[in-house]
Amino acid sequence: MKPNMHYTELKDTYLFNTIYRKTDEYLAAHPGEHVLKLGVGDVSYPLCKKVIEALHEAVDDQSKIKTFHGYLPEHGAMFLREAIAKYYSGWNVDMTTDEIFVSSGACDDLGDLLEMFDRDNTVLVIEPAYPEYVDTNLLYGRKVIHLPAGEGDGFLPLPDESIDADIIYICSPNNPTGSAYTREKLKKWVDYANEKDAVILYDAAYEIFIEEDDVPHSIYEIEGADTCAVEVCSFSKT
């Protein structure tokens, strides 16, 4: 048996574990200080009443013969996919339930989706970025190109025609920068992906925080995105 030697290409520790450790060390040395945590997008407050009520109702349903059910469809319960389609319709995105897949979480999908692509594909990651983008591709042995974002471009770099990428990661609004692509700028990425025959893995986990009219909540608001993009969203940030 041969191990996957690509594990040796990973960093010694997961980024967020390092952040937790440094935070704990700082608080131990500076007791009483308030630290703003900008690491993992974890919840900060108790769940709202509506969510708690829905959870209780779902548990109660499992105790009654008329409402009990075992495994749900592998791509998600129909009522949930219908609700998601309705949500997207608010952004003028026409989506059928057959195009919606519900999983155990966005993080899992960002890794699982890679099983559809050959290991020889080149990956483009806009930095700074969620560590999962890089780590999962390193485990597959793929070449990863890092496209730095900085103050000069508003942390929103545009495509470089000299780069031939097959898989492109875009997170908008971005964590940790908070920058978000306008429709005009995101269209440039969509056009680039279609031109290069590439796939955009679009991380829309933070779309609920968008307030500007010219910033799309979904990449599918952009013409041409339906032929080059897979959007991964999460309702855990709402």
Language-model region placement:
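N-terminal small-domain helix-loop-helix segment of the aminotransferase-like
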Residues: K2-S104, D112
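Nucleotide-sugar-dependent glycosyltransferase donor-binding/catalytic pocket residues
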Residues: Y45, G178, T182, K237
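Conserved core of the PLP fold type I
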Residues: K66-A193, E207-D226, V230
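Walker B catalytic acidic pair
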Residues: A204
